[in-house]
């Protein structure tokens, strides 16, 4: 489970959050 800089888990089905999470992972 990757974690976004804000502390939000990337493991979610919310498309917008996945987008932000993917950006944070890069």
From Swiss-Prot:
Record localization: Mitochondrion
Q: Which domain of life is it from?
A: Eukaryota
Subunit details? Homotetramer.
Q: Which residues form the active site?
A: 21 (acyl-thioester intermediate)
Asked whether the keyword Transferase is assigned, the reply is yes
UniProt record similarity statement? Belongs to the thiolase-like superfamily. Thiolase family.
The UniProt PTM text for this protein says: Succinylation, adjacent to a coenzyme A binding site. Desuccinylated by SIRT5.
Q: Which reaction does it catalyse?
A: 2 acetyl-CoA = acetoacetyl-CoA + CoA
Protein name per its UniProtKB record: Acetyl-CoA acetyltransferase
According to its UniProt record, where is this protein mainly located? Answer: mitochondrion
UniProtKB keywords: Acyltransferase, Mitochondrion, Transferase
The catalytic activity of this protein is classed by the Enzyme Commission as: 2.3.1.9
Please list the GO terms describing molecular function. Answer: acetyl-CoA C-acetyltransferase activity
Q: Name one GO cellular component term.
A: mitochondrion
Coiled coil ranges: none
In which organism is this protein found?
A: Sus scrofa (Pig)
């Amino acid at each position: 489970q990757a974690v976004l800089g804000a502390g939000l888990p990337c493991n979610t089905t919310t498309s917008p959050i996945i987008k932000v999470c993917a950006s944070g992972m890069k």
